Regions:
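Extracellular calcium-associated, cysteine-rich motifs in secreted modular proteins
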Residues: 41-477
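Sec-dependent, cleavable N-terminal signal peptides
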Residues: 1-46
Length: 477
């Protein structure tokens, strides 16, 4: 019997190590002809280079080159930290998250959604340590850090896995696109990269949507809770006032969309933003939602309590500091007459039979608006050119040069409120509807004195105390 000496034991160990190494080299080399069929999945995975960076997926820590390392993108439901087994596929498109450049199928690529808007860093195309992670997403070569995906609405779902990143009920896919140029996903993915064909110029280009930023602030609309910067939350403007539903705070299916905005968990409809004036801009992107020439930012607030936008947004949620209130509250839209729509959606705010379009734009008090609707909106902000002033393509101004509505808007009697909110414009004690002498429902054509000023704007009219109901008793009695 051969005696084992320390030298012989060392030699046998070395031989064993050599054999194991040889086997591993054989298995992970480019030739897999001798691998049994049951291990064929290893052949495919080891040969595949999803992002074409020259590093096989088997040793690439970021297979889809989105900057988010695979161990983050695989939610690891089986606990083995291996994206090959039971891989996570958030959007159920057949492409696992770690191979999917658009994991939530909203058209915005994960590399964009994982980063802050103003701190965005594009891939450098350099990978010094050959681990598959772009150098721009490692502090030092080999550190393997990768992006730490942001969660804009703090709902525990990072934006790249959240179909409603700002929690306003409007899908990111809708907010990332212009209204006129909107394209829904086609459901085709020719190159199998997880990005819908509608959002690639050509298969494999991986372009994705370039998210729209309506108000030009620090956040694109899909991360902006007030996309037009009028102080009214998108969640409010996207819905009818009468049927408004706030978020319930529940998300049964974990897709990032509040349950109030899905018919059933997983259906993912979201809100269909309303467009009150049927112009090219839905209300949440329209600074004048009902086309009366008065900006929503003005009409959403009281005249005496009007607060200008500050131009600051410390928490980077898209809502101006002036309207934050407590917990991103935004403005609570004013409703002067208390009977129908809030003022920013009400074409006759004071219910006096004279439209706001007239009362808010009649500076010479002749019953005819000095600025009239043209049907053209050169700067596409939702405010018609007729009300823009001299510069039709001015920088984005949510209040359109109105700094103090109490002095900047028509107010015939100088008391109570400006005309579009004053039931008695001339302060003669007769409500404007009662000065409709001919009873045709239009006080603007009643000029009893013939002086060119309609009675409702003329406190000195000779018929300042009519009997509009014909009962023999003057209206003022």
């Amino acid at each position: 019997m051969e005696k084992n000496t320390p030298t012989k034991i060392r030699d046998k160990a070395a031989l064993g190590f050599t054999l194991i190494t040889a086997i591993l080299v054989l298995v992970f080399s480019s030739s897999f002809d001798t691998i049994p069929a049951e291990y064929g999945f290893m052949t495919t995975y080891a040969e595949t280079d999803t992002d074409n960076d020259g590093i096989k997926d088997l040793i690439d820590i970021d297979d889809d080159n989105d900057g988010i390392i695979d161990s983050i993108e695989d939610e690891n439901p089986d606990g083995d930290n291996n994206p090959l087994t039971y891989p996570s596929d958030f959007d159920n498109d057949g492409v696992p998250n770690h191979l999917d450049v658009d994991s939530d199928n909203d058209g915005i690529i994960d590399n964009v959604e994982a980063q802050p808007t103003h701190g965005y860093i594009a891939p450098s195309g350099i990978d010094s340590d050959g681990n598959g992670l772009d150098d721009n997403y490692e502090e030092t070569p080999g550190s393997c850090g990768g992006l730490v995906p942001i969660d804009s609405d703090l709902d525990s779902y990072p934006d790249y896995l959240d179909i409603d990143s700002d929690n306003d009920g409007i899908l990111d896919n809708v907010e990332a696109q212009t209204t006129a140029g909107f394209q829904a996903p086609c459901g085709m993915d020719s190159d199998g990269n997880g990005l819908d064909d509608h959002y690639e110029e050509s298969p494999g280009s991986c372009g994705g949507l370039l998210p729209v930023n309506t108000d030009g602030d620090s956040q694109p609309d899909y991360r902006d809770i007030d996309s037009d910067n009028d102080g009214i939350l998108d969640n409010v403007e996207a819905q009818e006032a009468a049927s408004f539903q706030p978020p319930c705070g529940m998300d049964s299916d974990g897709n990032g969309l509040d349950d109030h905005y899905e018919n059933t968990p997983g259906s993912g409809e979201g809100l269909h933003p309303i467009n009150s004036d049927n112009d090219p801009n839905p209300n949440f992107r329209d600074i004048d939602s009902e086309n009366d020439g008065l900006p929503d930012n003005i009409e959403a607030q009281t005249t005496s309590g009007y607060i200008l936008p500050s131009g600051l947004d410390n928490d980077k949620d898209g809502l101006d500091n002036a309207y934050e209130g407590t917990g991103d509250q935004g403005l609570t839209p004013e409703n002067t007459d208390g009977t129908d729509e809030p003022d920013y959606l009400d074409s006759d705010t004071d219910n006096d039979l004279v439209p706001d379009n007239n009362e808010g734009n009649d500076f010479n008090f002749d019953g005819v608006p000095d600025q009239t609707f043209t049907g053209t909106d050169t700067d596409e902000d939702g405010l018609d050119d007729g009300y823009e002033g001299s510069n039709l393509n001015d920088p984005y101004l949510v209040n359109d040069e109105i700094t103090d509505p109490a002095t900047d808007l028509p107010d015939t009697d100088g008391t109570e409120d400006v005309n579009y909110r004053d039931i008695d414009d001339d302060g003669d004690g007769l409500d404007t509807p009662d000065e409709d002498t001919n009873g045709d429902g239009d006080p603007t054509n009643d000029d009893t004195s013939g002086n060119g000023t309609p009675d409702y704007l003329d406190p000195d009219t000779t018929n300042s105390d009519p009997d509009t109901d014909g009962d023999g008793v003057k209206d003022s009695t």
